[in-house]
Amino acid sequence: MAYNYRFAILLVLLSATVGFTAAALKPPVRTLNGNITLNLIWYGKFTPIQRSIIVDFIRSISSVTAAKGPSVASWWKTTEKYKTGVSTLVVGKQLLLENYPLGKSLKSPYLRALSSKLNAGGARSITVVLTAKDVTVEGLCMNRCGTHGSKSSSVNSGAYVWVGNSETQCPGYCAWPFHQPIYGPQSPPLVAPNGDVGVDGMIINIATLLVNTVTNPSPEAVSACTGIFGSGAYPGYAGRVLVDKTSGASYNALGLAGRKYLLPALWDPQTSTCKTMV
């Protein structure tokens, strides 16, 4: 029992929601709902395919296209059960910073400074800063995989989210269950649905932090369900998920352009349970 408890604590650390703890020390994010502009800043080198995986995920959140199975849009609808109500995300401006203008080692204040480079949508916006696999960020792999907060103390500044690509730095910490965990039972990792351990891991963390941002100040939306991706999950086991018959990849949500994603369970405030897609 003591071992299971310790491992459960470890899984909390493995989750991107550790970024929430860090974010809690920053100015609170104002409540966001309605139409929200989501700007993207790509810091470092991302391939066009990597960018499309992430952009397709964001566009899938508010898609009205019916999917033949569990979808990204239906996963997001759980956020409507929170006091913030309906939130529709629209991709705004994108900025590519492939020449590392601030270097390849970033301190935490740099993330907020970078997010201020795009302000489309004003107070009703979230700017997502994404750092490439060769960029080290203060705290990445040590106590967080991403974070979120307000761009500044101004109520009109909007929010920001940061997520790093952990592929070459700590995939067992920030890209589980697509990589064996750093500690605990070494069960075989799941096959990443888009064939990219780093980016598919980023999707989990982006999803986590976007939900935490729009449901703020209700941190339990994802953090209460850490490490759960399907029914029957327990520490070290992601749960029962769907498997692509051709690639063997694991997923639980369908997106636009035929994309498949693995998304974390969300806390359903109406049923007081962790809601999984499958």
UniProtKB/Swiss-Prot annotation:
Q: What is its main location?
A: secreted
InterPro entries hit by this protein: EXORDIUM-like
Mind listing the GO biological process terms from this record? response to oomycetes
Q: Name one GO cellular component term.
A: apoplast
Leader sequence segment: 1-23
Tell me where in or outside the cell this protein is found: Secreted; Secreted, Extracellular space; Secreted, Extracellular space, Apoplast
Q: Which domain of life is it from?
A: Eukaryota
**Sites where a glycan is attached:** 35
UniProt keywords (A-Z) are: Apoplast, Glycoprotein, Secreted, Signal
Quote the function comment for this protein: May play a role in a brassinosteroid-dependent regulation of growth and development.
The family classification in the record reads:
Belongs to the EXORDIUM family.
Name the chain's protein: Protein EXORDIUM-like 4
Organism, scientific name: Arabidopsis thaliana (Mouse-ear cress)
Q: Taxonomy-wise, where does this protein's organism fall, top ranks first?
A: Eukaryota, Viridiplantae, Streptophyta, Embryophyta, Tracheophyta
